[in-house]
Amino acid sequence: MTLNIRIIAPDRTVWDAEAQEIILPSSTGQLGILTGHAPLLTALDIGVMRVRVDKEWMPIVLLGGFAEIENNQLTILVNGAEEASQIDLVEAEKNLDTATQLLNDASSSKEKIEATQNIRKARARVQAATAASA
């Protein structure tokens, strides 16, 4: 059996295919989903989702959202998503360095919050690109 997975971002459908297993970055930690999973609605955090198709794992960066599983149908609504194969690792590492420097230079609470979010996004991109190139 397989899971039918649909990942929808505001601007496009990111993924619409079947897979054997999913690992989601939920707001309470990593969440593994296999066929026959109990119905569930969960909030997603910024992080790397891993999709297993046959014996290959594919990382996808998620920028927060929600996931619903019911009857082997997994619907994921996200604020944004990026497939690891489209991420340039060198650029992602530069973005992480820049975001870290912005956090160090931040003086207001708002700047610190924005910089922290940018670091989380950049870190997820680096993790996904590294996993894809391994």
From Swiss-Prot:
Subunit structure: F-type ATPases have 2 components, CF(1) - the catalytic core - and CF(0) - the membrane proton channel. CF(1) has five subunits: alpha(3), beta(3), gamma(1), delta(1), epsilon(1). CF(0) has three main subunits: a, b and c.
Alphabetized InterPro entries for the sequence: ATP_synth_F1_dsu/esu, ATP_synth_F1_dsu/esu_N, ATP_synth_F1_esu_C, ATPsynth_dsu/esu_N
Upper lineage: Eukaryota, Rhodophyta, Bangiophyceae, Bangiales, Bangiaceae
Family: Belongs to the ATPase epsilon chain family.
UniProt function note: Produces ATP from ADP in the presence of a proton gradient across the membrane.
Membrane association type: Peripheral membrane protein
Compartment list: Plastid, Chloroplast thylakoid membrane
Principal place of residence: plastid
Cysteines paired by S-S bonds: none
Name of the protein described by the UniProt record: ATP synthase epsilon chain, chloroplastic
Keywords of this entry: ATP synthesis, CF(1), Chloroplast, Hydrogen ion transport, Ion transport, Membrane, Plastid, Thylakoid, Transport
HAMAP family the UniProt entry points to: ATP_synth_epsil_bac
GO cellular component, one term: proton-transporting ATP synthase complex
GO terms of molecular function: ATP binding; proton-transporting ATP synthase activity, rotational mechanism
